Structures are given as C-alpha cells and as structure tokens.
Amino acid sequence: MEYRQLGRSGLKVSAVCLGTMTYGEQNTEAEAHEQLNYAFAQGINFIDTAEMYPVPPKEATYTRTETIVGNWLKHQQRDKVILATKIAGPRRKLEWIRGGPNAIDRENLRAAVEGSLSRLQTDYIDLYQLHWPERNVPMFGQYQFDPSQEFDGDTEKQWVSVHEQLEALAELVQEGKIRYIGLSNEHAWGVMEFLRVAAEYKLPRIASIQNCYNLINRGYEFSLTEIGYREQVSLLAYSPLAFGHLTAKYLEGGSGRASLFKGFAQRYEKPNVALSSAAYAKLAREHGYTPAELALAFVYHRWFVTSTIIGATSMTQLQENLAAWQKPLSKELLSAIEQLHLRYMNPAP
C-alpha cells in the first residue's frame, strides 16, 4: 500500500480509503468490523463516513454507520487511524438530521461535529468535510447550473457565506475537535472561493475535495484537475465502480445498490450508462481483467487521485477490490480507454 500526502495537511493517507456507507443497511455491525479489521491488516489507514449514512438515508437507520464505526474505533490505537466524516448540507429533505439541516452555519456545524464525535467515540476528527455545498449547485446527476433554483426561488433567503462557514470551522479546529477540513461534491468556483477566503482571512485551508470519479464520470478532469495540482488540494475519488455499473453485474441481470435503491443514484440512470459500461466490460475481458478490476485500476493509478474510496457489501468484494491495486494498466489499455471515453463522454455526470 502507498501512503500519500493529503493536500498541505500533516496527514499521510493510504492510496485506498475504506468507505462505510453500507454499514447499518446492507452490512451488519459484525460484517462491518470484519471489513475494517481486514482493510487495516492490508495497510489501509483511512476511513470515510458521514453523519447521513447509511444510504439510502432514512430516519430509521440514521446514525447507524458512525455508531458502528465508533464501536470498532474505540478498540483501536487512535493515532493509527485517519478518520474522515461529513456534515449533511441543506436542501436534501433530511428532516430527521438535526431537525432538518437548513444551513451550514455555526450552529449546525457545531451540532453536527458534536454528534459525530459522540457516535464515533473519539475526541477528534482528522478530516471534516462538507458533504455538499451550502449554495445551489448541480450535483448527484444534475449537470446544469440554474440560478433560479436558489432556495427554490425564494429571493428572501441567502446562503451562508464561505467566510462564515470557515470561521465556524476555525473555531472547531482551535478547540481540537477537527484537525483538517475538506469539501465534497464541489465545483471549481467553490474550491477557489474557499481557498481565497482562507488565505485572505487566515482561516483553515481545505486539504481535499471528495468527488465522484470513474470511467463514466470524469467531470473532475475538466476544471478541477489543474486546481488540485496547482493549489495542492487532494482528490478523494468516490464511486470508482459507478454504484456497481462498472462491474457489469447489472448488464447480466444481477442485483445491487442500483437495483435495490432505485432513484437514489440518478446520475447512473442516464441513456448511455449501459452502453458505455458494456463497452468497458468488453475491453476489460479482452485484456484479461474483470470489469471491476479495470474500473478500479484506472482510478487507483490516476496521477491526480490521492486516495480512492472503495466500498463493499461482502468480504469477497472487499478482497477483490483491494487485489485490483496490484494490477496497473498498460499504456495500450489506457489508450483504448481514452478511445472509449471519446465515444461515451461522461454519460453519468
């Protein structure tokens, strides 16, 4: 396993991060702890979770994932684990989370951090991320910015400024409750604004951005790759298997998260997702890879990806996902991937 610098932080994270969003829904606590133990035995030191998890989010399961992770974490040497979690943002109809998170402001940030610390049974969070932006942006399958959608057209409302968000996060950093901060599902303007405000007012600097990145969603490359490189903001790539679509199981009539939770991952319900997934699966098999190995190896070894977040619902899946780390792709195969990319350009934005 490789370990890489997370932005300008003092953290060295494993190149593979264990995601946890199935814990408490598709995985029991015992299964989750087995995964965590195995992953750490293989050299992973980085866990990603969120107050909103498990998915799909619902009141009946809210808090389960962080609680399960916390029950494991309390038996570990804390400084050997790099723990990341996230605050749920506004406008996602999650009324059971803190009474409905209507803003990423001082009050909500403090309540969210305190809740996560309690569930995770720890005194501090290594990387605290804003799960999605406070402001109106296209995300989770949307692909066009529409200013008329700001607060559903309510012109009296204002989103919490980046300055106010950073000031609230700075207080939590100063108190030792969080060490570093990051963004998620963010766009170029947001990243640069967080960097600008942090520099101007001497507030905490973002270390990372956690965005979707895979063979059928390479939107990060258009505007964020250069920003990440020049500003030293690390990419944490989530959904490398595109919610299972890049394993080819849905092409073969199999079941999984996309079939169990229809409508949850709308970005993968686009017209060319099946066609592009089939083309990548065919390419993988022609070169002696499984479709999942090709998809994972592609993301694992991109020069701008600091850590790839993987998730599994079984130990077999987890073992296969980690084994793909040992199978980098040849120049010939990477060239063939680029040809398919030109034919099926980002079908799952």
Spans of model-derived segments:
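N-terminal binding-site loop/beta-alpha segment at the start of enzyme catalytic domains
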Residues: 1-86, 106-111, 123, 174
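Conserved, mostly hydrophobic/aromatic
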Residues: 6, 18, 32, 47, ...
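N-terminal small/glycine-rich loop or linker at the start of catalytic domains
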Residues: 7-23, 84-99, 129, 136-144
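Active-site mouth loops of central-metabolism enzymes
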Residues: 20-30, 95-107, 153-160
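Aromatic/hydrophobic pocket-lining residues that form the small-molecule binding cavity
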Residues: 32, 65, 109, 113, ...
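Short, well-ordered amphipathic alpha-helical segments that serve as non-catalytic structural scaffolds
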Residues: 35, 107-117, 165-168, 280
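Active-site gating/metal-coordination segments in enzymes
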Residues: 93-129, 212
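Beta/alpha (TIM)-barrel catalytic core signal, keyed to glycine-rich beta->alpha loops juxtaposed to Asp/Glu
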Residues: 133-339, 344-348
